[in-house]
Regions:
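Pocket-lining segment of extracytoplasmic ligand-binding domains
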Residues: 143-251
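Gram-negative bacterial Sec-dependent N-terminal signal peptides
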Residues: 1-20
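An extracytoplasmic/periplasmic, membrane-proximal ligand-sensing/linker region
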Residues: 22-29, 33-44, 214-217, 246-306
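A structural signal for short loop-to-beta-strand junctions that line the ligand-binding cleft
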Residues: 98-112, 229-235
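Alpha-to-beta junction loops
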Residues: 73-81, 96-98, 137-138, 189-202
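Extracytoplasmic/secreted proteins, especially bacterial periplasmic and envelope-associated proteins
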Residues: 40, 44, 48, 67, ...
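Extracytoplasmic small-molecule ligand-binding "clamshell" domains
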Residues: 22-89
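Bilobed "Venus flytrap"/periplasmic-binding protein-like clamshell domains
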Residues: 26-51, 85, 109-186, 271, ...
Length: 306
């Protein structure tokens, strides 16, 4: 004899299954020193994407680059609007299915697709060039940052010799990580470090913190006289701008909607995209070739660590 379930039980089961299966989009945001401001800057993205995709969007605030990397690898992050090239490379080398390029963030000012790692000192300090920092305290930003560690570390190894573990053959008195770009900037301002690295486009109005980068972000967060209190004494070769990425193995239909919505956001609510991306940036087409140099450098670094 067949067992007949009450209709209400069947309906309840179907409802529970549908609720459980409801898709959501997780927007990865690197909070850093001003996580509240970063979350606020992405509220317009959340609203726009929810309207376009009909899907709930969660803002996932990450304390550091590693959290974004692990979020993608662990299916907890689906979208990053302006990802560190090194972090992108780290995910790509670990599992290519977890990261898919949508575009490269490109400067509105001159359409450049690159930025620089720079070394900052206080404007009233005697330091005018990298060589003047011998015996001083220096800070990188984050070990998973391109401009905050990968590129300047590689350049210092070539220029100064040694590595971070031996303070580049004893050139610096002390070398460490602050935890992020904003922390580096504030650490220089308050005298915690003699010098530190951050990232900037190096184009546009200097007094505004240039067109994009951490300097501009800090200035916009209330440090009106920031640029008059800092001096740049070194800059790296051009680094490819951060990519906009989605998680590669998310539901294909939802991914297609999400990619279309992000491109529409850039075109139809560009001020929102600018606020969330961290500067006067827009999206252009890209491919793996633009990031191959960074990928190769990360791969070489990983082999050295092993």
């Amino acid at each position: 004899m067949k067992k007949v379930l009450p209709l209400v039980a069947v309906m309840a089961g179907l409802f529970a299954a549908s609720v459980q299966a409801a898709p959501e989009i997780n927007l990865g945001v690197l909070g850093g020193e001003n996580s509240t401001a970063q979350i606020g800057n992405n509220q317009c993205v959340k609203t726009f994407l929810e309207s376009e995709t009909g899907t709930t969007v969660n803002i996932r605030n990450a304390s550091d680059y590693s959290a974004v990397i692990q979020g993608l690898l662990g299916d907890q992050v689906d979208l990053v609007l302006n990802m560190s090239p090194k972090s992108y490379a780290s995910v790509y080398l670990k599992d290519q299915s977890k990261v898919e390029l949508v575009g490269i963030t490109t400067d509105d000012t001159d359409n450049s697709k690159g930025y620089h790692s720079v070394v900052l000192v206080k404007a009233d300090s005697p330091y005018q060039k990298l060589e003047d920092l011998k015996g001083k305290v220096f800070s990188f930003a984050d070990p998973d940052s391109t401009s905050g560690f990968l590129i300047p570390n590689n350049q210092f190894e070539q220029k100064l010799g040694g590595n971070m573990d031996n303070q580049f053959n004893g050139f610096f008195k002390k070398v460490g990580f602050s935890g992020g770009h904003e922390q580096d900037i504030l650490g220089v301002l308050n005298g915690q470090f003699d010098a530190a690295v951050t990232w900037t486009s190096m184009v546009g109005d200097r007094e505004e913190g240039y067109s994009a980068g951490a300097l501009r972000k800090v200035k916009e967060n209330g440090f009106d006289d920031l640029m008059s209190n800092l001096r740049i004494i070194w800059q790296s070769p051009l680094i490819p701008n951060g990519p906009t990425i989605v998680r590669g193995d998310m539901d294909p239909d939802l991914k297609a909607k999400l990619v279309a919505a992000v491109r529409k956001l850039d075109k139809e609510d560009h001020s929102c995209f600018v606020k969330a991306a961290g500067g006067k940036l827009h999206l252009e087409e890209t491919s793996i070739s633009e990031y191959q140099t960074v990928i190769d450098l990360v791969k070489a670094q990983q082999k050295t660590v092993r």
